[in-house]
Design a protein with these regions (language model features):
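Small beta-barrel nucleic-acid-binding modules, primarily SNase/OB-fold domains
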Residues: 2-6, 17-121
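Classic N-terminal secretory signal peptides
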Residues: 9-15
Length: 121
């Protein structure tokens, strides 16, 4: 009986965990933490989750993100919240042979020394 409950719980976690991921296409990199993405006939402003950039922005972070996410790049969004109408999500690049694909772009900015992790994450 216990194994059955454990199997059912694992199945639910896998089912709902996968439902949180949505593929989208990058339309524009607005700043070091803000993207404009499209999903069929809708567009979203997406803020990278768990990443902090100094007030006034960081031009090097914006350029890094533009190089990592050219227009029409497919991305996977893992929503973590909403901030005044802006979707806050972990963003992963999809569909390329590049070694950095699949890694969280916020973590990439932090590893490059262009951003710092938010204390709340």
């Amino acid at each position: 009986m216990r194994r059955w409950w454990l199997a059912a719980l694992c199945a639910l976690v896998l089912l709902f965990g996968a439902a949180g991921a949505e593929a989208a296409e990058v339309l524009q990199v607005r700043s070091g933490t803000l993207l404009q993405v499209g999903d069929h006939n809708r567009t979203y402003t997406v803020e990278l989750a768990c990443v902090a950039i100094p007030e006034g922005g960081n031009p090097a972070a914006t350029e890094w993100l533009r190089a990592a996410l050219p227009r029409r790049t497919k991305v996977n969004l893992r929503p973590v919240g909403n901030d005044g109408g802006t979707l806050v999500a972990r963003v992963q690049r999809l569909g390329s042979a590049d070694a950095a694909i699949g890694s969280d772009l916020g973590s990439g900015l932090i590893a490059a020394g262009l951003a710092s992790p938010k204390p709340s994450c």
